[in-house]
Regions:
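Catalytic cores of nucleotide-sugar-dependent glycosyltransferases that transfer UDP/GDP/TDP-activated
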Residues: 1-212
């Protein structure tokens, strides 16, 4: 009888790992802490092959968490710009100083209907009643997916194991984009809270005691 060969932890570890979150270099809540506190461990393991992707919220001002490096990935940054995507490349000022790519998703505003159409026709994601508090994160996630796709095409080989980890619904369109357009990139999605969990916790219910 044939047996399945078990992979070692080293074989399971990706050669390149991207993490995408609305809270990369942009503190809103607890996800910022989750990612920032793991950055040192990840950079010790993967070095500059561990890359964070977040939104360029401070487009015209100074982001206190981010240090831009105009020489880092300079040629690739220009090629991405030539494709119509504006990004900043630098380091997140947390322990480990990982590479961070901040994406200005506003250039996708004129294409929002095409992007929402793609999500509907491919995955039946219904955006008909979505307002801008929904549309902007969708555009960011989609743009982040395209940035990751471009990086992988330029800097990896066919034997490299590449994974992209998307945090919360605000980035999920990026995972859907890669699943369709770049299926060779493994995708992961993590939700950090649910409506049910927030409701129970907010009303003083013994959530953890009832889990058993």
């Amino acid at each position: 009888m044939a047996t399945t060969k078990q992979e070692t932890p080293q074989q399971q570890c990706p050669d390149f790992l991207f993490e995408v979150s609305w809270e990369v270099c942009n503190k809103v809540g607890g996800i910022h802490t989750v990612i920032a506190t793991k950055a040192l461990t990840m950079t010790q393991s993967l070095g500059d092959k561990y890359i964070l992707v977040g939104p360029d919220i401070h487009r015209e001002g100074v982001n206190p968490e981010f240090e831009e490096d105009p020489n880092l990935l300079r040629a690739w940054k220009q090629s991405v710009y030539n494709d119509g995507i504006r990004i900043k490349v630098g380091r997140w000022k947390v322990n480990g100083n990982p590479i961070a790519i901040l994406v200005d998703f506003t250039s996708f505003f004129p294409h929002k209907d095409d992007i929402l159409k793609f999500l509907w026709e491919t995955y039946r994601v219904d955006s008909i009643s979505g307002q801008w508090d929904y549309i902007e994160p969708v555009l960011f996630g989609y743009a982040a997916g395209k940035v990751i796709e471009s990086y992988v095409e330029n800097f990896t080989t066919s034997t490299d194991k590449v994974a992209a980890h998307f945090h919360e619904w605000m980035t999920s369109s990026g995972g859907l984009y890669l699943r369709k357009m770049s299926p060779y990139i493994a995708t992961l999605f993590t939700t950090h809270a649910t409506v049910l969990g927030r409701s129970l916790a907010g009303n003083g219910q013994a959530l953890y005691g009832n889990l058993a």
